[in-house]
Amino acid sequence: MLDQKLIRENPTFVEENLSLRGKVYKISHIHELTVKKKEIDIEISSLQSESKKLSKLIGQVIGKSQNNNSKELNDLKKKGNEYRIKISELEEKQRILDKEVDDEVYNLPNFPSKDAPIGKDESDNLQIKTWGDPLIKENIKSHWEIGESLNLFDFVKSTKISKSRFVTLIGNGARLERALINFMLDMHTKNGYLELMPPALVNSESLTGSGQLPKFSNESFKCFNDDLWLSPTAEVPLTAFHRNELIDPKKLPIKYVAYSPCFRREAGSYGRDTKGLIRLHQFNKVELYWFCDPSKSLEAHKKITSDAESILKKLNLPYRLVDICTGDLGFSSSRTFDLEVWLPSSKCYREISSCSNCLDFQARRSSIRSKIDKKNTYIHTLNGSGLAIGRTMAAILENGQQTDGSVKIPDALVPYFGSNFLKTA
C-alpha cells in the first residue's frame, strides 16, 4: 500500500511515479479523501483535548462547590456531553472515510523502482545474462509427449476428476515431483532459510496484505461458505505470518522457504499453454521470502535471485536472467528479476521464477514494522520462486531427453530420485 501521507501531500509525485507502469492513474479523488480524513483527525484531536480540559474543570468545580446541581456545573456537564456526541459523530465519519480511502488506495500498485527499465510490456524486458548452452536440434519432443510415453502423468483422467488444466502425476512422475521438492527445500535450508509449511487456505486479510486482493479476486478460488481462499502462492501466508507485528530488528533479515500447493484460476490466459505442465490451475512451488531492514533490501534482492538461480545451476538447466520493465511489473513489486528456463521443444525461454523486491508495500498493507533507528518503521519484503516444480520438471524432461526415449536425471537430483535415468517400464 502506498503511503497515504505522500498521497495527501504530493499527489503529482504519486501520479508521475505510477504512470511509469504505462497507465494513467488519477488520484485526485483519493487525494481529496485523504485531506478530509486528516482534517477530521485534527478536529477530533482538538475536541478530545478540549474535553479533557473540561473534565478537569468539572472536577475542580465539584471540589469547591457544596452544590452538585448548580447551574455552572450543569452547564459544564452539558458542554461535555456535546463534546462526546460531536466526537462520536466525527469518529463515525472517520470510519466511513477510512473505508473509502482503503478501498481506493488498496487498488493502487507499487511504485516502480527508478532502476527498472522503462517499458510497456514484456517485449521491453531487458535480458541481463544467459547461463548454460540451450539444446537446439531437430526432432525434439515436448515434455507432455515425453510424459505420455513414459507414463509420468495423465491430463485426460484429471479432467474427469476436476476439469481441464489439472494433472495427475503417476509413478515416476510423482516420484520426480517429490524429489524436486525435497531437493529444493534442502538446498535452501542449507543456505540459511527456515522452512515453514503454511496452510493452503488463507483469509481475505492475508490476500489483501500481500496484494492479491481486492484487485485480483477473479484470479483466485474462493470457498463458498467461508472467508477462505485457496492460496495462489506461499507468498500470501508467508507475508501474513508476521502481520500486525513489531519485529525485533536483531532478528532481521528473516528468511523463510516454504513448499506449498498453489491454486490459480488463470482467468486471463484462455487459450495459452493448453498442453503440458506450464499453466495449471493447481501446481506445486517452493517459495523464498525475506523480511529485511529497508536499507538492505537492494542487496537482499540480488541474494534471493542468486539463491533461486543456484537451483537451476545445480540441475544444469540453461536459463536467462531478465530485468522486468515498469509496464510488466507485478502489482506489489517495485523491481523484479525473472529467471526463464530453456524449453527446447518451443525454442524459447519460459519463466520459472520471479524474484521481487516489494519495498514496504506489503509491510504497510500488513502492518509489519521494526524499531529501526529508534523509530517504528515498515520493513521491506522480498519474494521469489525457488522454483516452480512443474515447470522445473518440464525443463528436465525436455533438456534431458535421450535418443532412446529415456530422460537423464540431473546429477544433483539422483540421490533424491534414486536412479540416473527415467525409462519406460
Curated annotation (Swiss-Prot):
- What is the enzyme's class at the highest EC level? ligase
Q: Which InterPro entries match?
A: aa-tRNA-synt_IIb (IPR002314), aa-tRNA-synth_II (IPR006195), aa-tRNA-synth_II/BPL/LPL (IPR045864), Ser-tRNA-ligase_type_1 (IPR002317), Ser-tRNA-synth_1_N (IPR015866), SerRS_1_N_sf (IPR042103), SerRS_core (IPR033729), tRNA-bd_arm (IPR010978)
Give the main localization category: cytoplasm
Question: Is Metal-binding found in the keyword set?
Answer: no
User: Which GO biological process entries does UniProt record here?
Assistant: selenocysteine biosynthetic process; seryl-tRNA aminoacylation
Q: How does it assemble?
A: Homodimer. The tRNA molecule binds across the dimer.
Q: Where does ATP bind?
A: R264, R265, E266, E351, I352, S353, S354
Domain of life per record: Bacteria
Entry similarity comment: Belongs to the class-II aminoacyl-tRNA synthetase family. Type-1 seryl-tRNA synthetase subfamily.
Catalytic activity field: tRNA(Ser) + L-serine + ATP = L-seryl-tRNA(Ser) + AMP + diphosphate + H(+); tRNA(Sec) + L-serine + ATP = L-seryl-tRNA(Sec) + AMP + diphosphate + H(+)
Q: Which residues bind L-serine?
A: T233, A234, E235, E287, S385
State its role.
Catalyzes the attachment of serine to tRNA(Ser). Is also able to aminoacylate tRNA(Sec) with serine, to form the misacylated tRNA L-seryl-tRNA(Sec), which will be further converted into selenocysteinyl-tRNA(Sec).
The family database entries (HAMAP family) matched by this protein are listed as: Ser_tRNA_synth_type1
Tell me the route in metabolism or biology where this protein functions. Aminoacyl-tRNA biosynthesis; selenocysteinyl-tRNA(Sec) biosynthesis; L-seryl-tRNA(Sec) from L-serine and tRNA(Sec): step 1/1
Tell me which Gene3D superfamilies the record gives.
Answer: Bira Bifunctional Protein, Domain 2, Serine-tRNA synthetase, tRNA binding domain
Supply the domain comment.
Consists of two distinct domains, a catalytic core and a N-terminal extension that is involved in tRNA binding.
Q: What is this protein called?
A: Serine--tRNA ligase
UniProt-annotated location(s): Cytoplasm
